[in-house]
C-alpha cells in the first residue's frame, strides 16, 4: 500500500481538480469523496488514474448487503486502490462489500483494499451518546467497530489519531489505521473535531493520513504538501 499522505480532492468539479493537480509533477495518492464523485461520476476516477495517481474512493457505503455487494462489484472495475464502507452497516454488509470487490476486480488486477469508517472525526462523544444512543465512550465504540471490521476480514479502519494506537494493540500493526483531520500546526479545524498534525499522527500510530485544506487551500500547495510529507516521513 502506498503510504504517501493522501490528498483530499474536495473540489466541486473536474476543472478545479485538474487546476490543482497540474501543480504537481509526481504521482500522488488522492482521495475522491462524495462531493466530487456525485458531480462528475466515475469518469473523474478514470481521468485521475490516467494521470498515474493512486485513488482512495471515499464513498462510505452503508446499505443492505446485496446493494453494497453490487455497488462494490462496479467500483472494483474503476481500478481504485482503496475504498470504504461504514462499519455501522454490520458484519454481513462488510463481508458482502469484500465479496463484491473480489467479484468485480478484473483478472490479473489487484483488488482494492477495503476499510471501514468507525466514527466520523466530526462526531463528539456527547453527540454519539445522545444522537446515536451508544452507551459507550467514543474510544470504546471505535474499538468495537474496529474488532467487527477485522472479523469481517477487511484491511483496516478510518479513525482519528486518538484511537490509532489502541486499534493497533487490539487488531495488530498490519491492520490499517487511516486518519483524516490532519492539519499543520496553527491550521483551522473547520468541521473536524478530532484533529492532529502529520508528525503527531505518526507518533500516535496512524498508518495513513488524509490531508485536505492544509494543502488544497494553501497559497503554494506544492510547498504545503512537501511540509506535510516531510513531517509524516520524519
UniProtKB/Swiss-Prot annotation:
Key words of the record: Decarboxylase, Lyase, Pyrimidine biosynthesis
The pathway to which it is assigned is: Pyrimidine metabolism; UMP biosynthesis via de novo pathway; UMP from orotate: step 2/2
Which SMART domains does the record match to this protein? OMPdecase
Reactions catalysed, semicolon-separated, are: orotidine 5'-phosphate + H(+) = UMP + CO2
Q: Which domain of life is it from?
A: Bacteria
- InterPro entries reported for this sequence: Aldolase_TIM, OMPdecase, OMPdecase_AS, OMPdecase_bac, OMPdeCOase_dom, RibuloseP-bd_barrel
- The EC number of this protein is 4.1.1.23
For substrate, which residues are the binding ones?
Answer: 10, 31, 58-67, 121, 183, 192, 212-213
Key word Cytoplasm present in the record? no
Q: Which residues form the active site?
A: 60
A molecular function annotated in GO for this UniProt entry is: orotidine-5'-phosphate decarboxylase activity
GO-annotated cellular components? cytosol
GO biological process terms held by the UniProt record: 'de novo' pyrimidine nucleobase biosynthetic process; 'de novo' UMP biosynthetic process
Q: Which Gene3D superfamilies does the record cross-reference, listed alphabetically? A: Aldolase class I
EC category name: lyase
The Swiss-Prot or TrEMBL record describes its family as follows: Belongs to the OMP decarboxylase family. Type 1 subfamily.
> Subunit composition?
Homodimer.
What is the documented function of this protein? Catalyzes the decarboxylation of orotidine 5'-monophosphate (OMP) to uridine 5'-monophosphate (UMP).
Q: NCBIfam families, alphabetically?
A: PRK00230.1, pyrF
- Protein name (database record): Orotidine 5'-phosphate decarboxylase
Species this protein is from: Lysinibacillus sphaericus (strain C3-41)
The encoding gene is pyrF
Amino acid at each position: 500500500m502506498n503510504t504517501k499522505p493522501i490528498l483530499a480532492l474536495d473540489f466541486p468539479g473536474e476543472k478545479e481538480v485538474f487546476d490543482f493537480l497540474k501543480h504537481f509533477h509526481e504521482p500522488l495518492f488522492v482521495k475522491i469523496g462524495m462531493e466530487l464523485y456525485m458531480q462528475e461520476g466515475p469518469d473523474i476516477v478514470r481521468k485521475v488514474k490516467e494521470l498515474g495517481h493512486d485513488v482512495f474512493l471515499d464513498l462510505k457505503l452503508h446499505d443492505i448487503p446485496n446493494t453494497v455487494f453490487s455497488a462494490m462489484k462496479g467500483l472494483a472495475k474503476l481500478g481504485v486502490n482503496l475504498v470504504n464502507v461504514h462499519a455501522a452497516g454490520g458484519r454481513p454488509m462488510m463481508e458482502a462489500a469484500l465479496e463484491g470487490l473480489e467479484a468485480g476486480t478484473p483478472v490479473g488486477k489487484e483488488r482494492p483494499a477495503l476499510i471501514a469508517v468507525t466514527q466520523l472525526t466530526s462526531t463528539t462523544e456527547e453527540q454519539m451518546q445522545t444522537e446515536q444512543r451508544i452507551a459507550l465512550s467514543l474510544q470504546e465504540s471505535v474499538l468495537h467497530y474496529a474488532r467487527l471490521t477485522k472479523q469481517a476480514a477487511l484491511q483496516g479502519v478510518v479513525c482519528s489519531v486518538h484511537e490509532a494506537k489502541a486499534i493497533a494493540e487490539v487488531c495488530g500493526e498490519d491492520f490499517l489505521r487511516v486518519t483524516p483531520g490532519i492539519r499543520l500546526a496553527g491550521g483551522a479545524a473547520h468541521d473536524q473535531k478530532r484533529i492532529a498534525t502529520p508528525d503527531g499522527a505518526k507518533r500516535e500510530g496512524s498508518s495513513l493520513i488524509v490531508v485536505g485544506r492544509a494543502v488544497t487551500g494553501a497559497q503554494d500547495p506544492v510547498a504545503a504538501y512537501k511540509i506535510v510529507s516531510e513531517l509524516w516521513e520524519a
